[in-house]
Amino acid sequence: MQLKRVAEAKLPTPWGDFLMVGFEELATGQDHVALVYGDISGQSPVLARVHSECLTGDALFSLRCDCGFQLEAALSHIAEEGRGILLYHRQEGRNIGLLNKIRAYALQDQGYDTVEANHQLGFAADERDFTLCADMFKLLNVEQVRLLTNNPKKVEILTEAGINIVERVPLIVGRNPKNAHYLDTKAAKMGHLLNSKPTE
């Protein structure tokens, strides 16, 4: 186990009242958060979203990505479902950090795509470690998940880490002229499924 559960409190939102659960990485002290809605106990699969931190999209309303749109849509879907979890994964910029993300944006402004920009900075296309999220699910006693994602790699990694992903639920929102090339690149080079139906 790479994390410990350290604190929790109620978090009222426009979609309803969530329970905010804080986790801390044992090795680094980095914090992560889960937002839990309703009763997630029991054997039935839980609707969940693993959402990686995106300051620009989540808090600053950037149109360069679909992150903020996905965050809002996921919370809305979870509330409509009546139960579910959003894991807020503190690995900004696909885990290259905020300043390197700004550098990557500058390269994109020069014509590089999101993958090429990461490579120019010496990073892989995606540096995230989703095994931390598997530990968060385990600390919340969740074993079966209906995962809100367009990223099959997330499904694969969480499955390998012991989480039973019984369904992939697409979350296709927020496409606009400013992020169309970015989304097309994620589909073409990173395998994201952006025109798909749920899989079981």
UniProtKB/Swiss-Prot annotation:
Keywords: GTP-binding, Hydrolase, Metal-binding, Nucleotide-binding, Riboflavin biosynthesis, Zinc
GO MF terms, alphabetically ordered: GTP binding; GTP cyclohydrolase II activity; zinc ion binding
Gene Ontology, cellular component aspect: cytosol
Positions annotated to bind GTP: R49, V50, H51, S52, E53, Q70, E92, G93, R94, T114, T149, K154
Pfam family, one: GTP_cyclohydro2
Enzyme category, top tier: hydrolase
Residues binding Zn(2+): C54, C65, C67
EC nos: 3.5.4.25
Substrates-to-products reaction catalysed: GTP + 4 H2O = 2,5-diamino-6-hydroxy-4-(5-phosphoribosylamino)-pyrimidine + formate + 2 phosphate + 3 H(+)
Xref: SUPFAM superfamilies: RibA-like
Cofactor: binding comment: Binds 1 zinc ion per subunit.
InterPro entries: GTP_cyclohydro_II (IPR032677), RibA (IPR000926), RibA-like_sf (IPR036144)
Keyword Metal-binding applies: yes
Cofactor: Zn(2+)
Entry's Gene Ontology BP terms: riboflavin biosynthetic process
Active site: residue positions: D126, R128
Spans traversing the lipid bilayer: none
Pathway participation: Cofactor biosynthesis; riboflavin biosynthesis; 5-amino-6-(D-ribitylamino)uracil from GTP: step 1/4
Function: Catalyzes the conversion of GTP to 2,5-diamino-6-ribosylamino-4(3H)-pyrimidinone 5'-phosphate (DARP), formate and pyrophosphate.
Subunit structure comment from the entry: Homodimer.
Similarity remark: Belongs to the GTP cyclohydrolase II family.
Protein's UniProt name: GTP cyclohydrolase-2
Natural source organism: Klebsiella pneumoniae subsp. pneumoniae (strain ATCC 700721 / MGH 78578)
Gene behind the chain: ribA
